[in-house]
Amino acid sequence: MTKVADQKLSRAGEKNFQWAKAHMGALTTLAKKYSRTKPLEGVSLGVCLHVTKETSVLIDAFLGAGAAVKLAGANPLSTQDDIAAYLSTRTEVWAWRGQSSKDYDWCIEQVLGARPTQLVDDGADLHVAAHRSRAKGIVGGSEETTTGVVRLRAMQAAGKLAYPVVAVNDARTKFLFDNRYGTGQSTLDGIMRATALLLAGMKVVVVGYGWVGKGVAMRARGMGANVSVVEVDPVKAIEAHLDGFGVSSLEEAAHWGQLFVTTTGQKNVVPYAAVEMMKEGAILANAGHFDVEIDVKTMLSKAKSVREVRPHVDEVLLPGGKKVYLVAKGRIANLVAAEGHPPEVMQMSFANQFLAAVRVHREHGSMERRVYGVSAEDEVARAALKSMGVTIGAQTKEQREYAKSWEA
């Protein structure tokens, strides 16, 4: 049975659903096309995604294609309660903002208890939970995030992956736009909503220079911040340097940075020892999926006091008397303190999720127990271009033949 914060919020949720839908033409075009043939008829989808207005458009597409859907939120603090209420009028939902870890795990168990045949995940918590005891009957799934794909590839390497999974995150139409432009804009949106401080002139330290880090660094510089990058990969460090950013070690940056944003998907990239070196008033925020990038556990265990000074901002008084500020409790700032990615970006990511579900249903019998790349990049890109009002040309026959030739 559905469990959401407040069913009375459903009308507000429907309005936000309609707003997002109007700005997600790539997904809605595909949804309309596939609603005629119902390619997901008979499929039971277990879904664990951030319950946002954009996600509601994907759920609508799944339902229109004939699937039965059971939904849980992908983070204890990211659910938009009005959207959860609206979706609960159309399918079963277990999601509300402000869950405990126990609540979060319980919601995932409700989805798995419905015996889905395919999984759609963000962060791989649903996949991992299924592998503990409920993988039987699941024919395949998909994964949205860098973090989740890393976990699933580790499972594959260990010989533990029980079914094929499509790595939506590997799609160019996902990581080039969602990870970079989506996270770049929405992370700063979350930080600015939470702190209400001026970014212009601020010394911002971006930890990690993958696609997410690139997006955050680019947007922070666009707001007038003085941006430096911390990176352990020498190639990415060169890239950051040639992109015009300062590059330093975390130990160096800790002494002068004012805002630190983690973007790596790794654990303890800002350890407590670095926090101790930071200047009075330093702000820490995380753009990664899990709350492990900043060593929040150690910091809070050693703190003399912790108090909320603004919504989504905790003041942490360190043993030496210094104060630092933690945004969104170290969880994913763009979804906790703001609304997540813009719909124009999510139209592509979720179009890939939609097509991945169709692919798994059609092809799972011939797929191996491993992580697969996406297979419909052009279809998604062309639908997105159309929704943006952009037209492009095509190669001529002569050019296609030249590309195949090897003689001068």
Please identify what each model-predicted range represents:
Residues 9-26, 42-44, 52, 163-201, ...:
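Adenosine-phosphate binding glycine-rich loop
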Residues 66-68, 135-137, 163, 224-225, ...:
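A short helix->loop->beta-strand "cap" motif at the edges of active sites that frequently abuts
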Residues 1-40, 71-79, 84-202:
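Glycine/serine-rich phosphate-binding loop and adjoining beta1-alpha1 elements at the start
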Residues 49-66, 178, 182-256, 262-267:
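Glycine-rich phosphate/diphosphate-binding loop of Rossmann-like nucleotide-binding domains
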Residues 29-32, 63, 124-128, 133-136, ...:
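Rossmann-fold NAD(P) dinucleotide-binding segment
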